[in-house]
């Protein structure tokens, strides 16, 4: 981010601190007198699903109540300012949980099965309530999994990418993972950030799904990522004893129960046709292989 750092004005913030958030938003308003539109993107969250089972109260406070704090600050701004504010809330496909229909779109019923998803669902509905009840310009982006080279090291896709890099460099022999049979709809964060921005450029606010419309198992992601670096992975054994073995009969993937979630989301597959039609949203990274290639960069 060095190329844009001189243009940024960074502040410490905490979604559990209403006073601090209010001071920051009012400071932005004072420093930008005469602005036409003020766009606020709420991307802050405790976003690790498995960890949300370990710290459910914190997850609810930050991901759920934290969003309400922002909305309430916006609601109490002077009307002349409030009407210029546009608010984006980062929703998640995890809200669909044990899916009730496939593919999932804006009308699919939610069925969350993690503290993270439940907190995000509260934020989703509060965003709608403040839009419909107070006339605020608020929108929910229901984003399916989106990755990039900046993905956190404790997330599945980056664990695989970094693990392969470590295998190549000789720092480790295999990668240890959890459930490899769950299915996900993976896209690139660059495309999805473009979609977020497009949502706040519309005359009227609404909610939109961003997804690729393709789903792959974690197993397939592993195979394709290894293949990109010249490894051909096949599988031996079952359950916790299953291993991924390369073309030289060296074990490269093992399974550990500690990485399983208490409740597993088995299948996520999004339908972004509304965003494509109404926002003109298009994806640059249109295949899983292009995504993997960029994650190795």
Name what the model sees in each region.
Residues 1-146, 190, 200, 267, ...:
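N-terminal Rossmann-like NAD(P)+-binding domain of SDR-like oxidoreductases, especially those catalyzing
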Residues 96-98, 149-151, 217-219:
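A short beta-to-alpha transition loop/helix N-cap that caps and shapes the active-site region
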């Amino acid at each position: 981010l060095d190329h844009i750092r001189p243009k940024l004005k960074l502040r410490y913030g905490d979604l559990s601190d209403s006073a601090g958030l209010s001071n920051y938003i009012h400071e932005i308003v004072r420093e930008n007198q005469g602005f036409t539109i003020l766009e606020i993107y709420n991307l802050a969250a405790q976003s690790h699903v498995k960890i949300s089972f370990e710290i459910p109260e914190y997850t609810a406070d930050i991901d759920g109540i934290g969003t309400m704090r922002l909305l309430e600050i916006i609601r109490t701004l002077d009307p002349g300012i409030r009407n210029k504010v546009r608010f984006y809330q980062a929703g998640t496909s995890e809200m669909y949980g044990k899916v009730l229909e496939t593919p999932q779109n804006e009308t699919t019923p939610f069925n969350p099965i993690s503290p993270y998803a439940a907190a995000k669902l509260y934020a989703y509905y509060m965003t709608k309530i403040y839009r419909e009840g107070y006339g605020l310009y608020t929108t929910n982006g229901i984003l399916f999994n989106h990755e990039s080279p900046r993905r956190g090291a404790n997330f599945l896709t980056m664990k695989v990418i970094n693990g392969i890099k470590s295998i190549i460099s000789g720092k480790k022999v295999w990668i240890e993972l959890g459930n490899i049979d769950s299915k996900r709809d993976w896209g690139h964060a660059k495309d999805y950030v473009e979609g977020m921005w497009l949502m706040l450029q519309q005359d009227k606010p609404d909610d939109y799904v961003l997804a690729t419309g393709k789903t792959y198992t974690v197993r397939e992601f592993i195979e394709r990522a290894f293949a990109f670096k010249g490894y051909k992975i096949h599988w031996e054994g079952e359950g916790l004893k299953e291993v991924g073995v390369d073309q030289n009969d060296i074990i490269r993937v093992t399974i550990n129960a500690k990485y399983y979630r208490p409740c597993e989301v088995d299948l996520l597959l999004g339908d972004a046709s509304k965003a494509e039609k109404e926002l003109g949203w298009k994806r640059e990274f249109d295949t899983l292989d292009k995504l993997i290639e960029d994650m190795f960069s």
